[in-house]
């Protein structure tokens, strides 16, 4: 069975998807981390995004792996553990631009579909239920008010990167979220959008456990007629 969880930034997708997967014994895949890993590789190797041939050559030879170490997922690019590095400022500021490129999305879509073969999994991202797994058994789309999402983003960044975010403000986070929403929803290839058959949950005033409970209720009641 494949469950997809999509939605804009700071709606709690990763945390919710991970907890859901743990509660039902499924494998959790954070596709945002995959895009960050690829972005890290592109930046490290100084790949010119305006040169399609150079980019495609890198994608053809891109080495990516996921390993579970001490119960945590670690992401490897060219055999280097980049799990912490992909959360850095440079990757964060570049990942939207990289992820909007058709060749990049096609490469990662192929990887994601390969990872899904023969397993029960929860895939979290922005186009999981619309493009990557259009026949997923269960599709979830998370939303949230902009002010709540901005506060979540601010708290997350200032907690993880206290030194780098000394000048960060809540207003700046709100501005960046609005900009990111617009960019993701209007990009030419595989834009962020809600699947017609998705179960929509507004996470603004709900705890993580409450959202997971809603998804489990939905899972128990839906008739999963679509093949995985």
Curated annotation (Swiss-Prot):
EC number per UniProt: 2.7.4.25
Coiled coil: none
Sample GO molecular function, one term: ATP binding
Catalytic activity entry: CMP + ATP = CDP + ADP; dCMP + ATP = dCDP + ADP
UniProt cross-references to InterPro entries, sorted A to Z: Cytidylate_kin (IPR003136), Cytidylate_kinase_dom (IPR011994), P-loop_NTPase (IPR027417)
Binding site for ATP: 7-15
Record-linked Gene3D superfamilies: P-loop containing nucleotide triphosphate hydrolases
Annotated compartments: Cytoplasm
Gene Ontology terms describing biological process: nucleobase-containing small molecule interconversion; pyrimidine nucleotide metabolic process
Key word Transferase present: yes
Top-rank EC class of the record's enzyme: transferase
Keyword Nucleotide-binding attributed: yes
Protein keywords: ATP-binding, Cytoplasm, Kinase, Nucleotide-binding, Transferase
GO CC annotation: cytosol
HAMAP family membership: Cytidyl_kinase_type1 (MF_00238)
NCBIfam families: cmk (TIGR00017)
Family: Belongs to the cytidylate kinase family. Type 1 subfamily.
Protein name: Cytidylate kinase
Lineage of producing organism: Bacteria, Pseudomonadati, Chlamydiota, Chlamydiia, Parachlamydiales
Gene symbol of the encoding locus: cmk
């Amino acid at each position: 069975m494949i469950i997809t969880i999509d939605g804009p930034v700071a709606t709690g997708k990763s945390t919710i998807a991970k907890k859901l997967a743990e509660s039902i014994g499924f494998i959790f895949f954070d596709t945002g981390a995959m895009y960050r890993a690829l972005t890290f590789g592109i930046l490290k190797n100084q790949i010119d995004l305006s040169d399609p041939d150079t980019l495609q050559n890198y994608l053809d030879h891109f080495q990516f792996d996921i390993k579970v170490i001490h119960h945590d997922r670690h992401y490897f690019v060219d055999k280097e553990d980049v799990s912490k590095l992909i959360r850095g400022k440079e990757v964060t500021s570049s990942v939207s631009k990289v992820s909007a490129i058709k060749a990049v999305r096609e490469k990662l879509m192929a990887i994601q579909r390969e990872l899904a073969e023969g397993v029960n999994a929860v895939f979290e991202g922005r186009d999981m239920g619309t493009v990557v797994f259009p026949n997923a058994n269960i599709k979830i789309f998370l939303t949230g008010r902009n002010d709540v999402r901005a506060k979540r983003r601010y708290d997350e960044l200032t907690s993880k990167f206290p030194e780098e975010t000394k000048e960060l403000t809540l207003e700046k986070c709100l501005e960046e979220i609005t900009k990111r929403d617009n960019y993701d929803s209007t990009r030419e290839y595989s834009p962020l959008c809600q699947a017609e058959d998705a179960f929509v949950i507004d996470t603004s005033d709900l705890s993580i456990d409450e959202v997971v409970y809603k998804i489990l209720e939905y899972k128990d009641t839906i008739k999963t007629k679509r093949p995985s």
